[in-house]
Structure formats: structure tokens, C-alpha cells
Amino acid sequence: MSEKKNIYPNKEGCPVEFTLDVIGGKWKGILFYHMIDGKKRFNEFRRICPSITQRMLTLQLRELEADGIVHREVYHQVPPKVEYSLTEFGRTLEPIVLQMKEWGESNRDVLESYRSNGLVKDQQK
């Protein structure tokens, strides 16, 4: 199992940084969001996120599992079946992720406007 670069970031410091370490990054929040609706299998995540590599998906799920956010259920059958679901502890992050979703839906156009017409372009002139 891989180790995180920063297992316990700023342990005595910023709780926001600590939370972002758990659900931050390109894929963890997306994987988490899709597990809110229920269990997912590995290949379901591959269909949901076609640009994620198998290696990265495995690493992200392992990190979420190591943090106690995700439960990995292995069914001993042929072909092998593995399902991922949120733990009770993981569900405590659900309101945060749903609020992030709501913010994204409400502010996508504003952010895109800033990105296309905003400060970055003004500084390049």
C-alpha cells in the first residue's frame, strides 16, 4: 500500500488543511461524491471517471480506505467482486461535499467569466 506524502499535515494547525488532505486532490472528492448514492464497483468508477488511470484510482481508493472514509468489501466469488462504500465516519463529510457541489453549480458561470476575462488577462497586457 502506498503512503501519502503528508500523512498528518499540520497536525496541530489548520483544520481546513487537514480536511482537504482527506478529500482534496483531483479524484478523491469525485469518488466520494459518487459513493454518496451507494456502493460502487471499481469499473463503475472507471466509467464515471474515464480519464483516471487504473493505478491512480487504486491509490485514491486505498487512501480513502486508510483514512477510514471508505469501506472495501471483497466478495469471495468467481469472478471476484469488490464494492466500495462510505463508512459511517466517511458520511460525516457528506454535507461538506454536497455543499461544495451546490457552490460549484451556483458559481460555475461566475468563475468561468473570471477565468476568461479576469485578473490574469489584465496582468498579461
Swiss-Prot record:
Molecular function, one GO term: DNA binding
Gene3D superfamilies (UniProt xref): Winged helix-like DNA-binding domain superfamily/Winged helix DNA-binding domain (1.10.10.10)
Keywords: DNA-binding, Transcription, Transcription regulation
Coiled-coil zones: none
Start and end residues of each HTH hxlR-type domain: 14-112
Stored InterPro entries: HTH_HxlR, WH-like_DNA-bd_sf, WH_DNA-bd_sf
Alphabetical list of Pfam families matching this protein: HxlR
Record's protein name: Uncharacterized HTH-type transcriptional regulator YybR
Organism field: Bacillus subtilis (strain 168)
